[in-house]
């Protein structure tokens, strides 16, 4: 401890710090590769001019990414989302300060900055993250709103955040208890753990507990960072990008008149018909279900979900991107997978084609709503391996007296 002023010894009780940097390399490599995969898939889209008027776009970024105004429209969800997101921003800054002091000798962790920010503020925001996780878990597992998607991934994300924060408080509390840190009171929650631990644990036990928990905390944190680009947590990157590249034209101004007599096809019939911004939109989805909640058809009881369509398209995009990257050919198709080349424009089998039925993406079975008998069912036709023209979700009418899609 530096007697000249408030601070603490970095990596107290931790040896073999070199191992942390060895583990950091694959962590960063895995995370960067995951992010690169997303960017590579977006680059396959058609051009879209979305970088004009930077001042207006920065203003949108500040309002909706930083201030999170849209998220705050749902008061309860907005509060816990801000607790978690702002808390992680502060914790990340604090970790960066430690790294700068330890690796570059910046001596930032001194004096009032150490007391007011690195101790008190960081402790406070760490507690807000825990409170946010508790609120999110209560909403997801007790209230259970219908608009949410209930997956193991969401559970693991909340559990990982919970474990990371709890470990941080334990490491801090046991360090304060073992060293009798004179500045420990500035970390109220860590100090609470220290006061509770002193009567129960010897100094030697505190050392062992601190060391073991520190390495476990490192492993969980690095694992979470590496895993992040492969989960819906990728929205911490895609959401700000999506907001910045928003369509600034007035609502409806981008629509074009369609000549129904001369136009041969409507919309898009393959992933190649989407712009890069459309593909970014798919990856920016957080599965919150707000689009489905305000869907007029869904509001009147029709089980049509815009959210499910977005997730279907995203699964298809990711599937096609993985397959095309492997460079596999048609002969590598799974059994009964539909080849779009085996059908003509009328959907009939062509010579040399195989009469193969459409199959669903395995993930989509969980998400697809049960459509009423009169409603069309959404089926995903898997693309050809290595094909540049994968099939998109197809509205296939279910047998009924009327094949018209129910309207709200």
Which sequence ranges carry the predicted segments?
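Ferredoxin-type iron-sulfur electron-transfer modules in oxidoreductases and energy-metabolism complexes
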Residues: 255-282, 290-292, 298-322, 333-358, ...
